Regions:
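Short hydrophobic/aromatic patches at helix-to-coil boundaries
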Residues: 101-105
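Bacterial N-terminal signal peptides that target proteins for export
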Residues: 1-10
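Conserved helix-turn-beta segment immediately C-terminal to the redox Cys motif
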Residues: 28, 55-60
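Axial heme c-ligation environment in periplasmic c-type cytochrome domains
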Residues: 36, 45-56, 69-98
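N-terminal signal peptide c-region/cleavage motif recognized by signal peptidases
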Residues: 19-21
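Domain-level signature for proteins that mediate thiol-based redox and metal-cofactor handling
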Residues: 35, 59, 63-64
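Sequence/structural segment immediately N-terminal to covalent heme-attachment motifs in c-type
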Residues: 23-40
Length: 105
């Protein structure tokens, strides 16, 4: 019985540790106002992050391209509504956000 509780506790702890970075990146997206136009799984004003991840899967320049778009904004890729620039996001935060987004396939 103690072994079962120990194993169960270990699995729960491992799950929480694995979820922590994802939650931290979601929090960063919220703090950076990204969630005003994007959601993880549904189109809002801009594309869902899952759609972005699918579109850029296998693109070796995706991290660089999307990190630049987070900072400078962009237009024409997902329709007529432009993505505004977000100068308040630091370059390392943009990279962190994009790595997270690309992991959401």
């Amino acid at each position: 019985m103690k072994l079962i509780k120990l194993v169960t506790s270990a699995f729960i702890a491992a799950g929480l540790l694995a979820a922590a970075p994802a939650m931290a990146n979601l929090d960063l997206a919220k703090k950076s106002n990204c969630m005003s136009c994007h959601t993880v799984d549904k189109k809002l004003v801009g594309p869902s992050y899952q759609d972005v991840a699918k579109k850029y899967a296998g693109n070796k320049d995706a991290l660089k391209t999307l990190s630049a778009k987070v900072k400078a904004g962009g237009k024409g890729v997902w329709g007529e509504i432009p993505m505004p620039p977000n100068a308040a996001v630091k370059p390392e935060e943009a990279t962190k956000l994009v790595k997270w987004i690309l992991s959401l396939k």
